[in-house]
């Protein structure tokens, strides 16, 4: 992997780490300069910016007594295409979110894909766009306050 590949993959993993820690404000800061597509199939697509994403997460993600959503986001199969000259990149990856609440079972609650775009600004890679795709949806009742049409 090139340096760009590693730095971009680290952005994917940092998102998962911050979300699982319940550090929503730090997590949303990863998208400070990005457009986030929540529903690409809607007409027009549902798109939010950093502040809209924070408002959504704050109202939607259940934070449990330990200060976390009690989740583990596993991000895998990142397929990256980096254009070093243009200082842009795309990445298609998959995610599966596991959750365990109280004495309940550890279970997958949702799985899907992230379709990301990145740009290099002042020598650092950052998200410029993220599209969420939910492919498989389980019991989200302990993770989200509503299903948002999932």
Regions found by a protein language model. Give the residues of each.
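A solvent-exposed, acidic/Ser-Thr-rich amphipathic alpha-helical stretch
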Residues: 24-95
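A beta-strand edge to alpha-helix "cap/lid" segment located at domain peripheries
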Residues: 63-150
